[in-house]
């Protein structure tokens, strides 16, 4: 449900984080909210009523580390997991600073260098 997805509290928190990056835009794809830069997806919000989640790109090795350290929160998402993407469940108490850090890293990996360089240093 497209309109239902937009009402999710987790998406209301995630959207402004994702749209804060240079040239980032949101678009609904496959019934889910996706966030892109230059038409490449760097973050997706999965609007599952019981278990909303975000999927984003992660550097090599990060997926194993995150999922291994906290499998209740992090998981290997379908379709894109084999590319190293990581999923984070947003149904528990969410550390939105951690979300912002994950999404920022994903944006840096996805955006053209010129745009990524406009972000403040970590």
Model-identified regions with their sequence ranges:
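Charge-dense, helix-prone N-terminal extensions
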Residues: 1-122
């Amino acid at each position: 449900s497209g309109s239902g997805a937009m009402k999710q509290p987790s998406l209301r928190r995630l959207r402004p984080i994702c749209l804060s990056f240079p040239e980032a835009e949101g678009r609904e794809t496959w019934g889910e909210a996706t966030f892109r830069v230059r038409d490449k997806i760097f973050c997706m919000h999965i609007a599952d009523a019981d278990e909303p989640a975000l999927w984003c790109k992660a550097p090599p090795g990060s997926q194993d580390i995150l999922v291994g350290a906290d499998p209740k929160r992090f998981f290997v998402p379908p379709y894109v997991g084999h590319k190293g993407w990581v999923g984070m469940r947003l149904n528990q108490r969410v550390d939105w600073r951690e979300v912002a850090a994950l999404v920022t890293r994903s944006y840096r990996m996805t955006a053209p260098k010129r745009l990524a360089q406009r972000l403040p240093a970590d």
